[in-house]
Amino acid sequence: MRVLGLDVGDRTIGVAVSDPLGFTAQGITTVHRKSVKEDIDELKKICKEYAVELIISGLPKNMNGTVGEQGEKVIEFCELLKSELKMPIKMWDERLTTVAAHRAMLEANLSRAKRKKIVDKMAATYILQGYLDSI
């Protein structure tokens, strides 16, 4: 069963997919947001291409565990996505995933320009891998 991981932001959506057995996550793309309809259409294509059966979306939480304004936006988008795709979507605590992605890229000596291009799909990979490791 393939699982899709999402890091939903205001301007971009990082996307990762699991291997067919559900052991590892690989970042595949960053969707540059245009409109909710276009964003959902793009994710629909990806789900079809990879035969995805479950979506894991990162849920931004405050450090005290509460859901803030950005978390509410992500929940709202995921509800729309779920109704369009007719597919289960689970929310996953994404605290510090972007920080971890930046740290890994700094350790790999990637330039600022390269980091900016891939940080969202790297964060999606961390979110999805965290979920896969928990099951």
From Swiss-Prot:
Keywords: Cytoplasm, Hydrolase, Nuclease, Ribosome biogenesis. One of its GO terms (biological process) is rRNA 5'-end processing. It holds the Pfam family RuvX. It is an enzyme of class 3 (hydrolase). Its EC number is 3.1.-.-. GO terms for molecular function: nuclease activity. It is found in: Cytoplasm. The keyword Hydrolase applies. One of its GO terms (cellular component) is cytosol. It comes from the Bacteria. NCBIfam families: RNAse_H_YqgF. Could be a nuclease involved in processing of the 5'-end of pre-16S rRNA. Belongs to the YqgF nuclease family. This is Putative pre-16S rRNA nuclease.
